[in-house]
Each structure stands twice: as structure tokens, then as C-alpha cells.
Amino acid sequence: MILLENVKKIYKAKSGDVTAVDNANLKIDKGEIFGVIGYSGAGKSSLIRLFNQLEKPTSGQITIANRVISAITGSELRKARQEIGMIFQHFNLLWSRTVRENIEFPLEIAGVDKAKRRKRVDELIHLVGLEGRGDAYPSQLSGGQKQRVGIARALANNPQVLLCDEATSALDPETTDQILDLLLDINKRLGLTIVLITHEMHVIRKICNRVAVMEKGKIVETGPVLDVFRNPQQDITKRFVQQLTDSEDTNETIESLIEKYPDGKVIRLQFIGEAVERPVLQRLMQRSDIEVSILQGNIAQTNNGSYGSLVVHLNGEETAIQQAIEGIHQDQVELEVIAHG
């Protein structure tokens, strides 16, 4: 569906050339939600703006739906852009136009007649959950409602691809989840390919099928989201995964609990996919003569399956504890000893 081959973007500056995207290679399948994550300055925004040619690549080739979009110009490029919708961090709405008029705007530009425009706008208002707000102006809307308008406008011309440029970064956590749920619903209903960039691992976890990690213009790691959570390869990827698995509050809680258990061992278990549903602790207590205390745990869902972690205290004879740990390994659960007496 989308193919990037050795794509490079270099900006000219007084201080010298700046390579924003450095030999990027990506393949994004039709109908998937693909995330690109990186910190500020990683090259994410430059990368996504190459997809619809808001930025031209310095070198390399970009193919979308069997069309080499990096090689076309003029009317052919304008037509291609109608098949690629885009939403932005700060909404980019026309403040002098109502919700209906904002959504209708790309249809006007495309030359769609008035009756068809009206029908399409009604469909989109219903799709994004803005019934009753069609005559409101952007200044009368909440941040989440503004982004819903942006999504509806981006879908006006029935695009095959939706680009999301930090679309939830300006929203509070609750509204972020609502917008992510909407994007997930649109993806399932319309079979739309969604490419989003973000610096928040929560966004990747919640809706993406696969993820690419960017650092200093390079794509340093790609893979299914669950695989990346299971086995991050790069240091930057490990830091992003730790945003969810090792929060500061969680670490402080674990440290305070460890002080209460000077004997035995404190271990962290990582459950991925089907392992989440295995009765690991039940089997552990059945086959081991040790005491098992649960100190802390959480389970979360990704588009590829569940993952979770459990911090437990094992107390008993050293030999029995070691046998218990070996038994956990046999259950194919990842284990880390984080403290021992």
C-alpha cells in the first residue's frame, strides 16, 4: 500500500545541511494502523509530510497505492492528494466557518455539487459524533470536538490513507482516548490505512498494529507493537516502552515494598500475548514449598494482544526459590530478579 525506498530529506540552512530523514525504508500494509514514534527533532513530522508531498524528498522513492507519488506534479499530484487525508496537532480549522462549512471545504475545492456535498457532510458529522454541532463555530467547540471536525474534513473525499501529525498531543488524556477510539472505529469501518506520528507510547499501544521508532532522522527499529514491547532492541525503544511499564510512581512503590521484604527474592514477571491467561502463580504455589506475595501488577491491551507485568515476593528456602524460578521459565514467562535477601 505504502512503500518508502531509501528516502532522504535534507534542509538547507546557514549553518549547513540538516538531514531530517535519513535513508528511510518502510512498507505499510493496506488497512493497518502504523505508528511512528520519536522524540522532538527525530524527523517524524518531516517524514509524514513526505507522504502527501507537502515536503519533497531530496532522494528516494515514495509509492502509495501503486502510484509513485514522489515523481508526480501538477494536476496529477492534486488528484493524488485527494486520496490522502491529514489531521494536525492544532486542528488547522477555518475559524470563520461553521463545522459544516469546514467539513465541506475540501469538497468545494474538488468541485462536488452542492447536494452531494450536503449529503456527504451529514454522513461525516454522524461518523465522528458531532450531531447537533453542525452550525457551531470552532471557538464554540472543545479540543476533542475540534479534532473530530478535523477528522471529518480529512475524510471528506473518501481517502485511502489518513495521516495523523501528533493528532492527540494537544488533548487531555480522556479526550485523547476518545479520539483514538474514533480512529480505531474508522479504521475498522472503512478499512482506512492510518499512519500516525507521536511521542507518546500510550498512543502506539492503544491502536497501532506496527510501529517504527525514529532517532536523529533514522528509522532505528520497526515491528509489531507487541513484539516491540516484548523485546525492544534499541536504547531509545526501551525508554519508550518504559513510559508504560516502569513509571516513576511504580518504581517508587516497588522500592518501598522491597524494603519491607528483606528476605527471599522480589521478581518481576513479564506476560506477553497468551501468557497473560496462564495460571502461572497458581502452578507455582502448587509445585513449590514457598510463600508467594503479589506486590504490584498491571495488564494492558495492544492491537496485537495483551501484555502485563507482575511484581511478586518469593520467600522460603533458597533451593526452593531457585526451583520456583526455573519452573516459571518453563512456563515461558520472562522473569527478572529485582531484589534478593
Swiss-Prot record:
It is found in: Cell membrane. InterPro entries: AAA+_ATPase, ABC_transporter-like_ATP-bd, ABC_transporter-like_CS, ACT-like_dom_sf, MetN_ABC, MetN_ABC_transporter-like, NIL_domain, P-loop_NTPase. It is an enzyme of class 7 (translocase). Pfam families: ABC_tran, NIL. Keywords: Amino-acid transport, ATP-binding, Cell membrane, Membrane, Nucleotide-binding, Translocase, Transport. It catalyses: L-methionine(out) + ATP + H2O = L-methionine(in) + ADP + phosphate + H(+); D-methionine(out) + ATP + H2O = D-methionine(in) + ADP + phosphate + H(+). One of its GO terms (cellular component) is plasma membrane. Gene3D superfamilies: 3.30.70.260, P-loop containing nucleotide triphosphate hydrolases. The keyword Lipid metabolism does not apply. ATP binds at residues 38-45. Its EC number is 7.4.2.11. The keyword Oxidoreductase does not apply. It is a peripheral membrane protein. Residues 2-241 form the ABC transporter domain. The complex is composed of two ATP-binding proteins (MetN), two transmembrane proteins (MetI) and a solute-binding protein (MetQ). PANTHER family: AMINO ACID IMPORT ATP-BINDING PROTEIN, METHIONINE IMPORT ATP-BINDING PROTEIN METN 2. This is Methionine import ATP-binding protein MetN 3. It comes from Bacillus anthracis. The lineage of its organism: Bacteria, Bacillati, Bacillota, Bacilli, Bacillales. The gene is metN3.
